[in-house]
Swiss-Prot record:
Organism of derivation: Leuconostoc citreum (strain KM20)
Residues passing through the membrane, by range: none
Subunit (UniProt): Part of the 50S ribosomal subunit.
Record's protein name: Large ribosomal subunit protein uL16
PANTHER family linked: 50S/60S RIBOSOMAL PROTEIN L16 (PTHR12220), LARGE RIBOSOMAL SUBUNIT PROTEIN UL16M (PTHR12220:SF13)
SUPFAM superfamilies: Ribosomal protein L16p/L10e
């Protein structure tokens, strides 16, 4: 699973998710990509589940590029814990994905296989997505 090797601070602010992604909005490496149409946090477990779904369907053919990395920790407190007493313990890692960001790319397989693999990955993610093809240069 994807986790940072080292971080300067264990707990970070939640931040805002306004507007569109600044970069990474086009297919850069493969032939097809999975682009977010809504914004959300995506956990390292969700990224891994999508990766496994794609690679299992493609059966060792082609290549998958993961263009997001969960660099932000999220925290939570226990169920019966009262308010106050500081921020909770780090629970996991997330990547804030804004709309327009291409999260996964697939290449080296026929179009039908690539589209089906990306469709399987869509079901593992908490954002609405669309499958896009590389633009002819």
């Amino acid at each position: 699973m994807l986790v940072p090797k080292r971080v300067k601070f264990r707990r970070v602010h939640r931040g805002h998710m306004r507007g569109e992604a600044k970069g990474g909005k086009t297919v850069a490496f493969g032939e097809f990509g999975l682009q977010a149409t809504t914004s959300s946090w995506i956990t390292n477990r969700q990224i891994e589940a999508a990766r496994i779904a794609m690679t299992r369907y493609m059966k060792r053919g082609g290549k998958v590029w993961i263009k997001i990395f969960p660099h932000k920790s999220y925290t939570s407190k226990g169920v019966g814990v009262r308010m106050g007493n500081g921020k909770g313990a780090p629970e996991g890692w997330v990547e804030p994905v804004k709309r327009g960001k291409v999260m996964f790319e697939v290449g080296g397989v026929p179009e039908a296989t690539a589209r089906e693999a990306l469709r399987l990955a869509q079901h593992k993610l908490p954002v609405r997505t669309k499958i896009i093809a590389r633009e002819a240069e």
